[in-house]
Structures are given as C-alpha cells and as structure tokens.
C-alpha cells in the first residue's frame, strides 16, 4: 500500500514538472516573436531561429530537440482548439493567445493559395504549349510553410542547356530556345529603406565573391548556366534581388551546417 501511494505521488510530481516546463516554454517563445510572428523581419531567417531555440534550451536547461518538438505539439494543439471554438477549456489556451494573429495569417495565406490554384486550373491552355512544356519538380527555397521546412512545387522550367545530376539516371532535356521560361518569383517584403537594401545586397555579394572556390565541377557549371539564363530574363532590379536571395539562402545553409556541428 505504501509503495502504491509513493508511486502515485511520483506520477503527480512528474506531471507537475511537465506542466511547469510547458508554461516556461510557452513564456519563452512568447518573448521571442521571431519564432511565431509571420510579420517579423527575421521570421524566414531559419539560422536566426536556430540560434533563438538554442538560447531557449539553455535557459530552460532542456535539450533543444525536446523544446522544439514539444512546442510544435503545443502549437498544433492550440490551432486545433482555436478552430473548434473561441472559448476552449484546454489548460494552455489562455496562455497561448499570442498565437492567434499568426495562425489566422497562416490560414488566410493558405486560402489565398487555394483560390489562385482554382483559377489557374480553370484556365484552358494551348494544347501545343502543353506538349512542349516539360514539368520538373523543384524546391522553392523562398517559401516556408508553418512547420518551417521548405516546400516542393511542380513548376514548368525551360532552358537551352542540359542539367547533369550526379547519380541520377535521367537527364533533364532541353526545350526550344524561343519559348519563354516560367519561374516562381516570391513577393518581397522590404523591411528597410532603399539605401540600406542596396548596401546589404552589395555587401552580401562581396562576401560571397570572396568565398567562392576556384574549382568548379561540370555539374555545377551546367547548373550555373541554367541559373544565369533565368536571371537574364529579369530586369536589373529584379536580377539583383534574385542574386541576393540565392546567396543569402546558401549562406544560411552554411551557417546552419556549422551550427549543427556543435
């Protein structure tokens, strides 16, 4: 009997500790809007997010993986409760009210994408163009869904060069040079002034140029030619911005790789 009572008390203690951890985690995330606020200027800067999560984990004294996994569970639970009713009895519903705006923005963006997709599906395309267009699946490096991972979308890409991919049995065939390429151009959010934006573009390009390796493989040359052809279809301003987005993405990948080593 004494053993059973002790076990029950331990279970209650563990439950209280877990609840306190949840409350501490919710409060820590609330103080760091870069994690949840979609309008935050660093919301899509996943390296900055990784640094923030590392700081939260160190503050709470809990492994980073446990923090991110638990937060995803809490956030998804709150989103479901919010969809069901405005006055949920879930224990953390009031503490997580700061997520309401970001979740609504996310759902509105999804509705907008669905509406655009329906309009595109209703448009009748020229049969000859449908036969010429070659569909390739590419990773959209600029779109980030609510779970923070990159999305994959099917887009019609055409170019006059072949792309050779290592360990891939199929090669992407070339399409007619007279056909205009179609590609995804993300909406740009300018959080800073035009002068600061131009300075940042120049500084980023200079840093990247200083770090470029001289040894380039045939595969990389092939890919570079395709990217160059796509950039040449843009205006001067759009071309410069596209270069900066690509360079920043690669720089973030390098920083994240270094972060994961430690």
Curated annotation (Swiss-Prot):
Alphabetical GO biological process terms: regulation of transcription by RNA polymerase II
InterPro entries for the chain: BESS_motif, MADF-dom, TF_Adf1
Coiled-coil intervals, chain numbering: none
Keywords: DNA-binding, Nucleus, Transcription, Transcription regulation
Functional note: May play an important role not only in the regulation of Adh expression but also in the transcription of other genes.
UniProt-listed PANTHER family: COREPRESSOR OF PANGOLIN, ISOFORM A-RELATED, MADF DOMAIN TRANSCRIPTION FACTOR
Protein name: Transcription factor Adf-1
Species this chain originates from: Drosophila melanogaster (Fruit fly)
